[in-house]
Amino acid sequence: MIGALARKFFGSANDRRVKGYQSRVNAINALEPELIKLSDEELKARTADFKKQLAEGKTLDDLLVPAFATVREAAKRTLGQRHFDVQLIGGMVLHEGDIAEMKTGEGKTLVATLAVYLNALAGKGVHVVTVNDYLARRDSGWMGQIYGFLGMTTGVIVHGLDDAERKTAYACDITYGTNNEYGFDYLRDNMKYRLEDMVQRPHFFAIVDEVDSILIDEARTPLIISGPLDDRSDFYNTIDGFLPKLDKTDYDVDEKQRTVTLTEAGMEKIETLLRDAGQLKGESLYDVENVSVVHHINQALRAHTLFTRDKDYIVRDDEVVIIDEFTGRMMPGRRYSEGLHQALEAKEHVQVQPENQTLASITFQNYFRMYEKLAGMTGTAATEADELFDIYKLEVVEIPTNLSVARLDEDDEVYRTQKEKYAAILAEIERANARLQPVLVGTASIEKSEVLAEFLKSNGYKQIDFGKENALDKLYAAARAGKPSKLFAVLNARFHEQEAYIVAEAGVPGAITIATNMAGRGTDIKLGGSLEMRVPKETAGIEDEAEKARKIEQIKADVERFREIVLKAEEIVEIEPAKGSKPAKTVTKPGGLYIIGSERHESRRIDNQLRGRSGRQGDPGRSKFFLSLEDDLMRIFGSDRLDSMLQRLGLQEGEAIIHPWINKALEKAQQKVEARNFDIRKNLLKFDNVQNDQRKVIFDQRVDLMKDDSVAETVTDMRHAFIDDLVAKHVPEHAYAEQWDVAGLKEELKRVLDLDLPVDDWAKEEGIADEELLNRIENRADEHMAAKVAQWGPDVMRYVEKTILLQTLDHLWREHLIMLDHLRQVIGLRGYGQRDPLQEYKTEAFNLFQEMSAHLREAVTAQLMRVEIVPPEQEAPVLPPMEAHKFDPNTGEDEMALASVTLGAPASDAAQRDPKNPASWGKIGRNEDCPCGSGKKYKHCHGRYA
């Protein structure tokens, strides 16, 4: 009560913050008349002037007003668009490193240019993050006109670029790209062996478009670069063959927690099946030898009971492709881990791909927290404001709309069954289609979108085939004639290639579009259709300029006329009076785009995104959700009392209940799910932070090693530390000489250092101490390495040391990641022993890291003490080639298998190879003669070190 009164008199915290920007908005507006008078060259010259002021000590905040005014003027001259005052406020929020929540159609893409330009003046590179390659290309080309006009360079990172192209794009002042590409480039950079091969610069400032989708919806999905392990496809197929022999009493499914477990009867049945197939070791399924078998059975059960085709994944080109649960988009290249993807492949009877070993991984949560400054834009973030601040320290600022929202959001209609619900949706579509009001129907999955499509087909509607040219001609013709077309379009992961086109034309009179959650985020639905989309498509084959101009005028006339038709597509509804009240009255419901939701999502934010497709920039619109008690949210999380309440009300088939109380009950169910998902993500982050801290140490160490011309001091320190540990283990401090394990020490020195030292004789000397013994061993080891340097030369030795150190570090880090994954899978069991799993994980992970560090010292020392380069007769020592690997993030395949790493650029022709200079050898086949001139095959000479 008191809080509400305070807000009434003083405004909310959000209102006060927005008002605080007004003085700077006024200052920017005051500069406009002055900038209008400048020539293009004078306006462009302001960029160099701003950079000079920064160099002289001014801050970016000092330059905000003149820089924003400059961008606004440049946008007017290049795009014909002028930033509104509210867009200037959005730009300030982004510059301050927070999230600007702006409604659909308010020009988020244009808003970003303000903060991007200002921060790009620092010369450290600004990253703009989009959700797909199409938007990255579109926005970089579109907004790049502004930056280019002002003398700044723009790059774009999309799938399929090589390292040279990526490096060029990252070197630009502004770089557009997808979250996946940025993350994978970071991981790949930290698998390189030379600094000059790395493509990214240090992480300075990023603006994330659709920030809620990337930082919340995808937060649980780690980016993983992996390599294949042994092929066990037959085993997966064998296990999958058992599943049809189980019935529902053999396992328990918990949809809420998304878990499935075998019952006692199920265990006995599986044991019998495994024994008959010769796959059971020992007597019981739960004997230690069968741990992996149990794991595979559990994954097969999950694949069959918790994952649904066309909802969680689709089968395309004989491959199982994951569907993003929030966007509805396909995620080619992404694979479920821990054998689940292989279980799905066996279930669908497609080729089972080998399991993968993680080579490097990071979550978006930890990747984006590396930036000095992070900001974001979205139309819907307020419901997740707490999470965004808690994890990323980003505040959500709601930016006022330029024009007030004129959309009517109606109460939900709730039916008993899905069949009744779909019948009601069909009836609503038919009424809207009769008055030519465009309809966008949102569904939760491909499966549901195709069920609805079949409903429409069975009632005389035809699906538009976007594979044909001029696919929308019949829709346009019907709209011109003022008649319903009875045509509909489907937008889901199967048709994602035509996504932008389908969405852009969803505002044409009489258009019916069925969309999964993806709903074409990033593409506006303009009433009457999109001029920008139609003109290039419909004039592509016209060469005659006069004819092209006539066609463009016809399209413009179409779009304007169509817009008028849609605006007038209002519905007049007669409200039945209550008994004894006044006569019936009529209510006019607005035209514009009509959003129909076919079910509620777990997250209110996803529902708000769907509603937000309508009512852009002050346009009228409507939205309504049609629900049934058989929907997933209602069935899994809804209250059982709701069903009994509807039964008591005596609802007849086809009748709906409509009441604000229902909306509130649903919102509470959604809040419960959101809170649960937040807890899951927060807990995931706590565990991932442990690995992330270790990842930072390893990756920073790699960069430092690559920066150093020589790592001789590092490997010497490692050698001494290893010898210290070895001597301390066998010759305890303050122990008598008789208690020393001299034989064990001598054996270890021979095994690791390849040195046969008279340790037993030294131990017999009168008065010798452990410290003296340590010094003698270290001196002998140092002399051994000094002899190698003298033999091969310091340059060759420095190269060998660095290569062995980096390759060994990478190998052990990969093994360490596997250990951490295994630890994470079982650490939850510690909770049964009244121990905190997180604290236990931290302790165990630290111990594993310490062990890895000790193993690194031993492995590097052992390899360097043993490594030999056999020189050709009467020739100087030469450098052994080393193998490098670059693993593709999508396939996990090694793209550079057996590629030779050399000190210089490879020669293009074998004739240019200098036997004395390995840098000139280039790529060598393992069965070729060795270029050194020894007469041996490369694999038996220098190639054996690869």
UniProtKB/Swiss-Prot annotation:
Domain of life: Bacteria
Cofactor dependence: Zn(2+)
Binding site for Zn(2+): C930, C932, C941, H942
Location in the cell: Cell inner membrane; Cytoplasm
Annotated segments matching region Disordered: 905-926
EC number per UniProt: 7.4.2.8
Pfam family, one: P-loop_SecA
Keyword match Cell cycle: no
GO cellular component, one term: plasma membrane
Residues annotated to bind ATP: Q87, G105, E106, G107, K108, T109, D524
Topology in membrane: Peripheral membrane protein
Reaction catalysed by this enzyme: ATP + H2O + cellular proteinSide 1 = ADP + phosphate + cellular proteinSide 2
Protein name stated in the entry: Protein translocase subunit SecA
Family: Belongs to the SecA family.
Gene from which this protein is expressed: secA
Subunit structure: Monomer and homodimer. Part of the essential Sec protein translocation apparatus which comprises SecA, SecYEG and auxiliary proteins SecDF-YajC and YidC.
Signal peptide (residue range): none
MF term (GO), any: metal ion binding
InterPro entries named among the record's database cross-references: Helicase_ATP-bd (IPR014001), P-loop_NTPase (IPR027417), SEC_C_motif (IPR004027), SecA (IPR000185), SecA_CS (IPR020937), SecA_DEAD (IPR011115), SecA_motor_DEAD (IPR014018), SecA_preprotein_X-link_dom (IPR011130)
Gene3D superfamilies recorded: Helical scaffold and wing domains of SecA, P-loop containing nucleotide triphosphate hydrolases, SecA, preprotein cross-linking domain
Species per Swiss-Prot/TrEMBL record: Bradyrhizobium diazoefficiens (strain JCM 10833 / BCRC 13528 / IAM 13628 / NBRC 14792 / USDA 110)
PANTHER family cross-referenced by the UniProt entry: CHLOROPLAST PROTEIN-TRANSPORTING ATPASE, SECA INNER MEMBRANE COMPONENT OF SEC PROTEIN SECRETION SYSTEM
Cofactor binding note from Swiss-Prot or TrEMBL: May bind 1 zinc ion per subunit.
Record NCBIfam families: PRK12904.1, secA
Broad enzyme group: translocase
